[in-house]
């Protein structure tokens, strides 16, 4: 018999590389937040982690070459010049787009649209920390966000 499976979708601040990694270590304070969250969430399922490795690489506690997680570090802009040009090419409105809500047009210009975040979405508490510490105020954040640790 297979084990029960479940998942939880939690939203974090940043572009793809700010969430999944790929930037140099010195610019990786934001990516450590979802990584720490995934480690915390998967431990109860039996995944094992070396505490020293997590403390060094994720939490930056060793004082070595790894930066600690930080909700207030600058986020990246993944819209390169080439990508921005592509944003002016008309395309179909995706089914999960906020544009589907009340839109009658099947075609639109992306123009760097932000993702639609549902009202009942779980938003990581680090987004609130970023908002409280700076002028960060994403227009697609629900009016009454549900923040989770």
Residue ranges of model-derived segments:
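Active-site- or binding-pocket-proximal scaffold segments within functional domains
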Residues: 1-149
């Amino acid at each position: 018999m297979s084990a029960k499976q479940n998942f939880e979708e939690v939203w974090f601040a940043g572009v793809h590389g700010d969430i999944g990694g790929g930037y140099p270590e010195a610019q990786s304070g934001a990516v450590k937040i979802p990584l720490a969250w995934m480690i915390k969430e998967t431990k109860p399922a039996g995944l094992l982690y070396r505490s020293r490795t997590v403390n060094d690489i994720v939490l930056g506690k060793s004082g070595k070459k790894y930066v600690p997680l930080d909700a207030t570090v600058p986020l990246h802009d993944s819209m390169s010049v080439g990508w921005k040009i592509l944003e002016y090419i008309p395309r179909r409105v995706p089914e999960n787009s906020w544009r589907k809500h009340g839109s009658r047009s099947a075609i639109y210009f992306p123009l760097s649209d932000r993702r639609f975040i549902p009202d009942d979405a779980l938003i990581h508490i680090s987004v609130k920390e970023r908002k409280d510490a700076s002028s960060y105020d994403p227009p697609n954040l629900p009016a009454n966000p549900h923040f989770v640790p």
